């Protein structure tokens, strides 16, 4: 596993000797998240405050792209470690509040221009969604809510991000079918009963 931090000015910090990592992928909210731990020397701490994004690759393939939320350094008798945690690129839309607006007719290009492009997010591909008359953006909505409502409720598709951090606004493609059978070497199994988070949402206009 190879982890790389990118600073606000474009500098890259290649993380040494990754010892532990965890990636969580999903659609919508909560967005993708990551946590990675590597060996770290105390004298290298100053540059971490300038890191804004993270990329992980395995065997030459990018497996995660996201934003840095937290850097934690620790030391014990075995030496120093660095733990970096953050979320996928959807975090940029989730963390920013949209300006209230009323569109006489809103197109996908309008939504991308006003609510996605300002955050430096690349769009990989997009379906041809119909224009929406009298589309309103409520004050207090996140940029993600604006994009999600336009695409999901008026276009019938769910926006998502790929592992390179690019926004995908198109139906799912046919993928591979993976089967865990009796001959599969399962090393661990987790059963989670999650009793928190958004279970349902009612929007009233």
Task: Show the residue positions of the predicted features.
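Surface-exposed aromatic
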Residues: 128-137
